[in-house]
Amino acid sequence: MKCQLAQVTDAPEAIRTLKRFVADQALSERRNGREVTPTGKRVAIVGSGPAGLTAAYTLARQGHRSTVFEALPEPGGMMRTGIPAYRLPPEILAAEIEEIKRAGVEVKTAERIESLDRLLAEGYDAVFLALGAHRGVRMGIDGEDSPGVIDALSYLRRVNMGKCPTAGKYVAVIGVGNAAVDAARTALRLGAKEVTVVYRRTRAEMRANPEEVSEALSEGVKIVFLAAPSRIVTKDGRLAMECLRTMPGSRDAAPPKSIEGSEFTVEAETIIVAVGQEPEVPAGFPLSLTGRTIATAPDSMATSKAGVFAGADCVTGPSSVIEAIAAGRQAAIAIDRYLGGSGAIEERLAPPEEAMTPVKENYPSPTAIRNQIPLLPVAERLKGFPLVELPLSPETAVREANRCLRCDLPIVVEEANCRWCFVCQLVCSLRFEGAFDTSKAAIKLLPVVNAAGNRDVRISFDDKCDGCGLCVRYCPYGALTRGSSAGSNEH
């Protein structure tokens, strides 16, 4: 679900930025979790990305001995090798991993696992595969194996591991996902004079984070939309990409059609390919596959081999860090149950929030705009890899947090306060096809006759309601509020 603030203000809540603010405070306020009793069970986790580390930490908190195996010299997976330092400083990642180690997780680096049987023979009671999706997808065009052509993940990996490959003054990037944008911005920081990104669709269809795209453009990255490479050629030792203009079309439809006679050429010293990524499952893992990903049981994340589980990118294909963390937690639940536990992994380091009284007067104004997120000036960014997004001040963080509609709280219905003004239905109808048609609204007002024989109202919500709170915001009589109120109906 997307933040509902975007429905009624200029922008959604800056959730990611607020999470970072809280995390920055927490770095100096670490708390110990509950004491755990060892179960005597051992779990091997293959891959030290967000899914693997999350599963290992969570299983350790359940009392299982967790060991993480990482093929590279440093742990972190895609967080370490695929996300540039200007977005995720390696020292922050290292501090988080140290916290995981202190919870009892053992991390073995530079140790590639090629055989599942080896792990099971070593006495591990369960194995979790969190292999990620680190292999770039090929384009299938002539010349993509030419010297000077590299996939984005390999390029970012070399940079993040300290090898800093020189891309030259003129760089071309194919694709506009997050990896493509990261590679383009990284090339600028390594001295490229001109970086040109070629994408076969429009900006509205881009899969990359819109904020990252905007920052790339502000830094000087050029994006050529509605264009696709047809082949890569080398002439007189110079690399060039021959492209064709494409016709607009639906992102979910077949690849856009090329326009005859629209050829143009982009010359570059390095061409970075970022058209997709996929997992690489070792031959020594005799598992059932679905295409190029590992097949698992949806409810248990179990693979076709007993005792072996898999999750995140190697099962679903490329996803976000937060989705990988969620997969790691789900895997920990499944593995804990497999090992005889309850699967109850919830842990609170703070007391539960007390029941809240109805919220009405503190709702943000419909004109409340998003607070400006401080960014490092472009000239300073391009001198290296400093963090681009600067931390919020405590005052700004509080102002931004106060924009929240509190969608986590139920909508409290006080039918006795309803005056049949229909404002709730009118504003609700704006969210759906048929604006100002109250029959299209997700909130329903039903006339009834009460026990005293007087006309009354019953307020209900249909399945379209996603709790956006528009009705609460605009109800002038207090019939709809947020919070908990004894004796009232809640939705």
Residue map of PLM features:
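FAD-site-proximal beta/loop scaffold in flavoenzymes
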Residues: 145-169, 251-318, 333, 357-360
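Mid-to-C-terminal Rossmann-like scaffold of FAD/NAD(P)H-dependent oxidoreductases
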Residues: 214-218, 227-235, 247-250, 337-406, ...
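A conserved FAD-binding loop/helix module that cradles the flavin
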Residues: 183, 311-345
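Rossmann-like dinucleotide-binding cores of NAD(P)H-dependent redox enzymes
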Residues: 65-108, 184-231, 344-359
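Feature captures the FAD/FMN-dependent oxidoreductase FAD-binding
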Residues: 37-46, 94-141, 231-242, 270-272, ...
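Iron-sulfur cluster-binding cysteine motifs and their immediate structural context
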Residues: 1-20, 67, 74, 104-106, ...
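Glycine-rich dinucleotide-binding loop and its adjacent helix/turn
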Residues: 21-37, 95-110, 115, 136-190, ...
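N-terminal Rossmann-like FAD-binding beta1-loop-alpha1 element of flavoenzymes
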Residues: 42-67, 180-188
